[in-house]
Every structure is written in structure tokens, then in C-alpha cells.
Amino acid sequence: MEKRVWDWGIDLGGTKCECVVLDGDEVLLRHRIPTERHGGYQHMLGQIAKLVDECAAKLGQHPALIGMGTPGARDPQTGLLKNSNTTEFNGKPLKEDLERRLGVPVLIANDANCFALAETHLGTVRQHHPDAKVVFGIIMGTGVGAGIVINGQILNGHHGIAGEWGHNVLLPEGPECYCGKRGCVETLISGPALEAWYEARTKRRLSLAQIAAASAHDHVARLTMDRLHLLFGQALANVINILDPDVIVIGGGVGNVQSLYRAGRETVLPFLFNPRFATPMVAPALGDSAGVFGAALLARGVFREALLS
């Protein structure tokens, strides 16, 4: 009997790398190990190989193909990774280096694309908006990014940067961004950016969740949340005016702020080229599992031909 080919996915982060192996919708295995970023690029490649070997030993089967979600994106012209906040990966031929190490084809996609793909095919979009053709899947946490799924497949774009709304400039004189620009969305409404804005005015360091909870009685906390809502609405309206998605999924730590679904939503309309804002804004169903599940979906049949070409 021919051995069944399972779907292997790896979510590569700056802190940990996680592997999942799927048989259809069934999770056969989940396993994670530290990325050990301090060891440098070659050491991190070794950690990924170690993760694959450990999973293969548990399953008694090596992968035929691996999907991988990465910070940053693979440049379609050069094949090098770029725009990663785990800067050790930038300028490196990650796909080719991993294929040499692992001995199997590796399909690479931005981690936000993997998030959007998983929520479309396995998560909240499949459950509640199955007819959606265009999905904008937002991650708002330490950074701000997004993935775009159209007719079930990732949109990468000519430069491989489709969905990177976190690096649209909102305030040209705003804070410096690691990308080299100033006033990017990420420098304004990421979790660390909002926490820093609050701390600069109060000399108190609170988490965003604590700031949100204090906003009913703390004036600066209220201003911080107002800033989030206003800039979120402006930034999202710019996306909607171009993409006009059927559904918007909001993940990440900032995405857990419930007022985004009310006050944040209300601030979209003044910047929108339409008299109403009717697009569903929904929370993800898969939590922090979405990225690794999306990576596994990269290795599933319907995506292989497009991504290998």
C-alpha cells in the first residue's frame, strides 16, 4: 500500500519554531523547540533541521515537502529573505539553504499570509463566512502585518509584499521604523508602540491589556485607546479603498482589544470612499495556531503547483 503523504508545516519565529503535521483536518503531531536566535543564522538552520528530525522520529516518516511561515518575505526576484524583524534572516537564501539541509522541497510564505490562509480554510472564515472570496487577515501584536487570500490562495504580489499595511506611512514625522521610514502604521499601533506612547506621558509601564482596562478611569489610558482607534481606522480605510475585502480577520495581541470591533470600526468610515462600512470584522478561531496550520496548508495539493513554479 502506498504510504500516505501528510502535510508538514513549520512556523519560524524569533523565539521558537513550531512544527505541525496534518492528515486532512486531523492534527497528528505538534512540537516546538527554541529558535535560539542568539546563535546566528546557521545555528537557527540547525534548530529547524533538529525540529524536523525530532518530528520524523516521532511519526516514523520523513516529510516529502515542508511549508514554512517566516517573518518577512522571500523576494521573488532575488530569492533572498527581506523585511524580517528577525534581522538575521534578511539577505539570506533561506529556502535554498533549508532545502540543502533537509533534502526536501520547502515552500516559504510570510507568517501573516499563513495566518490568513489558515483562517480562510480551517478557521473563522470557513465557519462563518464560507462564501468570502477576498480575505484580509490582520496580525497586530509586536508588529503589524497582514495576509491577503483571494479565491482561496495567497496573493504575494510582484515584489512579494502584498498585505504589508504595517509599513504604509501614516505620520511622515512619526517614530522611526526598523524598515528605515518614519511613521509607519507599525510604529503607531503595534502593542509596543502604544505601550511606549502611554509610558512617555505617565512614566508608568503597563501592558496594552492593562491600558485598555484602565481607560475608564485613567485619562492618558483613554487617550491611548482613542489614538489606537483613530489610527487603526485611518490605516484600515486605506486598505479597504484599494482591496475592498469580503471579510477582515483581526489577530494578534492588539487584536484582542475588544473596542477595536466597535470604536475602531467607527473610525474607518470617515476615511472610506463609501457612505457605509459593512465589511465583517471578526476574531480568529485558531488563536496562535493559525500560523503553523497555514504553513502546513502551503504543502497541501491545491497550493503546491502555484508555489513551486
Regions found by a protein language model. Give the residues of each.
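A charged helix-plus-loop insertion that forms the helical arch/lid used to bind
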Residues: G79-N90
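Short beta-strand segments
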Residues: D11, G67-P71, A109, F136-G143, ...
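ATP-dependent carbohydrate kinase catalytic cores
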Residues: P105-T120, H129-P130, F136-I138
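ATP-binding/phosphotransfer module of carbohydrate and carboxylate kinases, centering on a glycine-rich
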Residues: M1-L65, D75-T78, E96-V104, H121-D131, ...
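Generic beta-strand structural signal
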Residues: V104, K133-I138, T142-A146, I150, ...
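Structural signature of FAD isoalloxazine-binding scaffolds in flavoprotein oxidoreductases
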Residues: I161-E164
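Short hydrophobic alpha-helix segments
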Residues: H31-I33, N85, H158
